[in-house]
Every structure is written in C-alpha cells, then in structure tokens.
Amino acid sequence: MLTISVPATSANLGPGFDSIGLALDMQLTLQVLQPSDHWQIDHPFGADVPTDERNLIIKTALHLVPDLQPQHLQMASKIPLARGLGSSSTAIVAGLVLANELTGATRSSAELLEVATQLEGHPDNVAPALLGGLVVATNTDGRVRAVKLPLPMLFASVYVPNEPLLTTASRQALPTELAYHQAVTGSSVANTLVAALATQNWDVALPLLEQDQFHEQYRAKLVPALQTVRDHAHALGLTGTYLSGAGPTVITLGDYGQLATLQAQLSQDTTLTGQLFLLPMDATGVKVQKS
C-alpha cells in the first residue's frame, strides 16, 4: 500500500507575503487502496468536496499525468479547510506525489515545486509542504527559487476560527497598489526578518512578524481574532503573532511553555470560539511510505 503524508503549512509569515512559509505537524494522509475502473477518493469532508475526478488531489495528479490509471483512494486530514493552513496546497502536493509514485517517475522536488507553484499561484505554501521546515521562495522570470532555512526550535500556537475565509474574498480586501514609502518599509522589514530567521535571532524575528506592511492591516477587519490574540500575547510579553496565509487562522510562534500559558488565556476569552492547537514544526515535508 502506498501512503502519502503532507504537512499543513502557514504562509505569509508576517511581512513575508507570498514568499515565506513553514510546515506544521498536522497532516493530510492519502492512501492508495487499489486500482479501479474509475477514480474514487473517500474523505471526511462531506458532499461539498468531490469524491471523483473533480477532487483537487485527483485533478492535480491528472494534470501531471493525464492517462494515469484510476485508483481507489482514502484520505484523512486534520487540516481544516479554508482556514489559512494550506489545505489546497497539501492537496496539490499530495496529487503531484501520487502521480509521481504511481508512474515510477523520478521528478525532483524542484520539478514538483515548479508545477505546484503554477497550480497554486505562489510558492509560500507548496514549498514547505514539499520540503518541510521554514522556506523562503519566489516565483519570478518563470522560475521558482526556494531556500530552506534552519528549522526553528519554536512551537506554534494556532487559533482556528470556526468560520472559513476563502482566499478569494481575503484577496479582494487587498489594495491594488502601495505607496512607495510603504513598499520600501515593507521590503526592509521583510529583508531583516529573513536575516533574523536565517540566524535564528528570535529577539529580532518575533517582533518583526508583527510589522507587516503588505496585507494584515487590510484583512484585519475580516479577522477580528488577530488583534484579540495579539493583545493576549502582548499582555504576557510575547510577540510573534501573525495572520496565517489569507486567514482566518492566527498563529503565535514561541517557546512551548509560554505558548501553553497563552493558550490557557485564550481558552478563557469568550469571544474566541474556535479551536486551539499547540504544534511543533514539521521538518521533512511530504513523506511517502510503501508497505
């Protein structure tokens, strides 16, 4: 049996808009049960998620290999849909690896990343899903360039609101252009953040996660929990709270003990009715097991 596991991802790390992402230890697992005369995928997400060729995992696999032999698949996932934790990216990566494995192809991670970025539109979710850990990536001149940084010895306090926020709606909240001085500030903050992440200088990196100039201020009205969680963190002397992906999930990075204290506070706030997770990073990205 072929089993593929793909980690959840958190993109747009602070000012790292569309470019910095990390993998979290929350998995989508895909099992290949047996060949079939038609595509079928069993999953726990109900009627809104297709179980045939319209399913994103299968669509992606067929994009890579159009004549792929149909299979009966089973998918389990702890990653909530449309919450800013890379649910679509994990499906895309699972589909690409599925096609790669079923055909015995030897496409490299770099080749799969190129295709995944074409399908997703930007690399900051698909790159950590493929590679694991903390990844800085860009898609320019028709080429994806990704750099995997040392794995942060940090944990993530993850607050997931009950209501989804579709990426399309969240994107519509963004301006079509930025003032020059704001763009320069955003660039300098992002550059310094990357340097701090690369050297694991958390005294610099964690505050900079809250200095985004590109998207959070425009999306904040759609995600009131962002300021609420940040206020609780600041009351404990913690920085490092940011909007994960397009939202609505809010993440705070830090020490396990400090984040456990934060989550105890968040659980007492009656305005926060969603789910809380305290997660380590995923170091390896997509994994394949054959049995």
Swiss-Prot record:
Q: Does the keyword Hydrolase apply?
A: no
Under InterPro entries, the record lists:
GHMP_kinase_C_dom, GHMP_kinase_C_sf, GHMP_kinase_N_dom, GHMP_knse_ATP-bd_CS, Homoserine_kinase, Ribosomal_Su5_D2-typ_SF, Ribsml_uS5_D2-typ_fold_subgr
Positions of ATP binding? P80, L81, A82, R83, G84, L85, G86, S87, S88, S89, T90
UniProt EC number: 2.7.1.39
Predominant location category: cytoplasm
Annotated catalysed reactions: L-homoserine + ATP = O-phospho-L-homoserine + ADP + H(+)
Give the record's pathway.
Answer: Amino-acid biosynthesis; L-threonine biosynthesis; L-threonine from L-aspartate: step 4/5
Q: What gene is behind this protein?
A: thrB
| GO terms, molecular function | ATP binding; homoserine kinase activity
What is the recorded function of this protein according to its Swiss-Prot or TrEMBL entry? Catalyzes the ATP-dependent phosphorylation of L-homoserine to L-homoserine phosphate.
- Name of the protein described by the UniProt record: Homoserine kinase
Query: Can you name the source organism?
Result: Lactiplantibacillus plantarum (strain ATCC BAA-793 / NCIMB 8826 / WCFS1)
Q: Which SUPFAM superfamilies match?
A: GHMP Kinase, C-terminal domain, Ribosomal protein S5 domain 2-like
From its record, what is one biological process in GO terms? threonine biosynthetic process
Q: Which NCBIfam families match?
A: thrB
Supply the alphabetized keyword list: Amino-acid biosynthesis, ATP-binding, Cytoplasm, Kinase, Nucleotide-binding, Threonine biosynthesis, Transferase
Question: What Gene Ontology terms describe where this protein resides (cellular component)?
Answer: cytoplasm
As for subcellular location, the record says: Cytoplasm
Q: Which family does it belong to?
A: Belongs to the GHMP kinase family. Homoserine kinase subfamily.
Query: Where does the source fall among the domains of life?
Result: Bacteria
